């Protein structure tokens, strides 16, 4: 049995250094963690409890919903609506802001989440995850409006993700570095196993969906072609290409051994300037990546500086090891 620092201990000790901390944030995070444990259990049991497969419904993104998309969204709501820490929630799976029911008190935070990132991988047993972000409510104790959620990523109080793989991990930042916790099922607690996570500045791995190559802009075409040319090309070294189709899995690999992840702007669907959701995926992951020493950009601007125009805005994403992201940025500026 692991006897290290639990997540609860870690957060309480961290809050002790913040003047005026009331414990609301710690309590909210504990509710999120309880939801993540519940989701982990549902994902791990999968077909045993009949939660695999797709439904005949689509989410606001126009994507066919998996059964687990709906189940995990409900888990996040039910575990976080009641305690009086939130003024509202927003989810990738819901068209509009989720208003806290009148029977519950309102708090000073907003919760934004993707309940099951990479859900297309569920039926084939590849790692999936949950992404979340905590913002301050502009008016504490008042029901949140859509406009309250449209804050740039620099305003995040906390961002994190859970990875449901060979073990369940929770990776978290509150703006003071990045730490990873592993769920010890014997004691039912997340235990600190990856303190002070840092992304190596250099890498020989890149992740991109190569089936979209014909739609990429020239800077990305150039970068990928040079990586593929390897030691015989202008980069003078060999690269490996990865693609899991799960942002949580991709970012976790980058946090542990370096790499660059790209879902760039393309011309496949001119109505969509990017594929990933700013509020539910790009902004939280960018906060984590930057806190771990990496960079995150659309190719044209820092993702954390973007103020969302709506709840489901999409953006291009290029993030990971600092030196490789700077190479791609240089090609965009050329």
UniProtKB/Swiss-Prot annotation:
Subunit and interaction comment: Homotetramer.
A GO cellular component entry from the record: cytosol
Catalytic function, reaction form: beta-D-fructose 1,6-bisphosphate + H2O = beta-D-fructose 6-phosphate + phosphate
Pathway: Carbohydrate biosynthesis; gluconeogenesis
Free-text comment on the cofactor: Binds 2 magnesium ions per subunit.
Residues holding Mg(2+) 1: 92, 114, 116
Top class in the EC scheme: hydrolase
Pfam family, one: FBPase
Entries under InterPro entries matching the protein: FBPase_C_dom, FBPase_class-1, FBPase_N, FBPtase
UniProt binding sites for substrate: 117-120, 209
Transmembrane segments: none
Name this protein carries in UniProt: Fructose-1,6-bisphosphatase class 1
Residue sites binding Mg(2+) 2 per the record: 114, 117, 281
Presence of the UniProt keyword Glycoprotein in the record: no
GO BP: fructose 1,6-bisphosphate metabolic process; fructose 6-phosphate metabolic process; fructose metabolic process; gluconeogenesis; sucrose biosynthetic process
UniProt subcellular location: Cytoplasm
Family statement drawn from the similarity comment of this UniProt entry: Belongs to the FBPase class 1 family.
Keywords: Carbohydrate metabolism, Cytoplasm, Hydrolase, Magnesium, Metal-binding
Cofactor requirements of the protein: Mg(2+)
